[in-house]
């Protein structure tokens, strides 16, 4: 590449950077048939979301997002952790209302089932406004919020739940009762409520029946030794259970962490940082190796103003030549388009090349790195080359 081309490319990158869509947070109020009040929701989209129309995003659901710092920290960390700089997420914050008629606890606690003497067994949760609507929140998620995200955003189909304290308990309860999410991050959860109900449910859950890859993270700060004996016992039981690999299938990744130098709220920062680091490792290793047993038809097109020379596609399975850079040769449709029809296991990870790794495609409408097809729809995927420098390593003079 000559000096003139390099200068032109740098100027073009500056121009693109100036015009690219920035990260954004949308505030939404949703009516729900399960609540008498509107549900406030925050939706974060990463930079370039509008431009990268062939990138589909995993969705992180963050509970207790009425504490805005919890929500903001999640999407900040997804950009700052350097393990996979091209892995970005949609982040959805679920805000609990704060009013004299509805407490935050009501979102996350089920009605006690072990209550003989209501006042003594419910303790500080004795007020009826302070518990009992967790089943309604699950219905809101499953039947209203998640379908809204699927309809209005490009989602990959993989969902992660993150909670702290009572909302962490709720996230784990979503797993044992509904398999609501694919992956779970529970920071400082309450395992002792209602006579250790959550821990007992975790013990009974049929872990070995779950065949898909799953990430589970749970942690505790100084509460593990400084809070009341019931809380300490709940954590001791749960952490011992989660630490025993014999309870889980091989493709379930479980992490148990302690942060004894941090109290309940300050512990959210170091714990979430550790959780996101571990999750990105899981995402870029385990998830990429797990393929569906079935194959699905996919029509893939690559477009450019002047499509000259041979083009190959290669990726993470036999139908994509198992990352051989001179993999599957694409068909030349016309001067601006080449295409290929394949039967692929999902998720499919792939790249376009000129036949070697020194000449890879610069894709304009997808995030850099591996291109990914997660879902069976749409069956046609159209990628566009950057017209100025469509291929790395080629002189465009």
Describe the predicted segments one by one:
Residues 306, 378-397:
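Compositionally biased low-complexity segments at domain edges in trafficked proteins
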Residues 296-304:
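A short, amphipathic beta-strand motif
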Residues 1-5:
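Positively charged n-region of N-terminal signal peptides that target proteins for export
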Residues 7-10, 394:
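Serine/threonine-rich, low-complexity intrinsically disordered segments
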Residues 10-19:
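Hydrophobic h-region of N-terminal signal peptides that target proteins for export
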Residues 303-347, 355-375:
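Aromatic-rich carbohydrate-binding modules that target alpha-glucans
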């Amino acid at each position: 590449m000559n000096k003139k081309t390099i200068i032109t490319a740098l100027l073009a990158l500056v121009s693109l950077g100036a015009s690219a869509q920035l990260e954004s947070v949308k505030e939404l109020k949703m009516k729900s048939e399960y609540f008498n009040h509107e549900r406030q929701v925050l939706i974060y989209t990463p930079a370039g979301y509008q431009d990268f129309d062939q990138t589909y995003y995993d969705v992180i659901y963050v509970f207790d997002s009425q504490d805005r710092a919890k929500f903001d920290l999640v999407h900040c960390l997804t950009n700052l952790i350097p393990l996979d700089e091209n892995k970005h997420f949609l982040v959805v914050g679920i805000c609990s209302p704060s009013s004299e008629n509805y407490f935050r606890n009501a979102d996350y606690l089920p009605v006690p089932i072990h209550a003989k003497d209501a006042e003594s067994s419910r303790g500080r949760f004795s007020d009826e406004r302070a518990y009992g609507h967790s089943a309604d929140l699950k219905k809101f998620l499953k039947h209203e919020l998640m379908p809204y995200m699927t309809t209005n955003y490009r989602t990959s189909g993989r969902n992660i739940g993150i909670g702290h304290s009572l909302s962490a308990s709720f996230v784990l309860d979503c797993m044992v009762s509904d398999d609501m999410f694919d992956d779970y991050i529970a920071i400082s959860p309450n395992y002792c409520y209602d006579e250790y109900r959550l821990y007992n449910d975790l013990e009974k859950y049929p872990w070995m029946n779950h065949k898909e890859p799953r990430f589970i993270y749970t942690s505790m700060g100084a509460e593990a030794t400084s809070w009341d004996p019931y809380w300490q016992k709940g954590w001791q039981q749960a952490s011992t259970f989660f630490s025993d690999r014999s309870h889980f299938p091989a493709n379930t990744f479980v992490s148990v962490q302690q942060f004894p130098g941090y109290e309940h709220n300050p512990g959210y920062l170091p714990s979430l940082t550790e959780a996101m680091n571990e999750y990105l490792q899981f995402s870029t290793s385990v998830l990429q190796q797990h393929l569906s047993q079935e194959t699905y038809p996919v029509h893939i097109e690559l477009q450019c103003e002047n499509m000259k020379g041979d083009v190959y596609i290669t990726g993470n399975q036999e139908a994509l030549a198992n990352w051989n850079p001179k993999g599957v040769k694409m068909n030349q449709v016309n001067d601006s388009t080449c295409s290929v029809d394949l039967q692929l296991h999902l998720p499919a990870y792939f790249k376009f090349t000129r036949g070697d790794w020194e000449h890879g495609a610069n894709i304009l409408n997808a995030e850099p790195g591996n291109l990914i097809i997660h879902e069976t729809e749409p069956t046609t995927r159209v990628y566009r080359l950057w017209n100025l420098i469509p291929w790395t390593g080629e002189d465009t003079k």
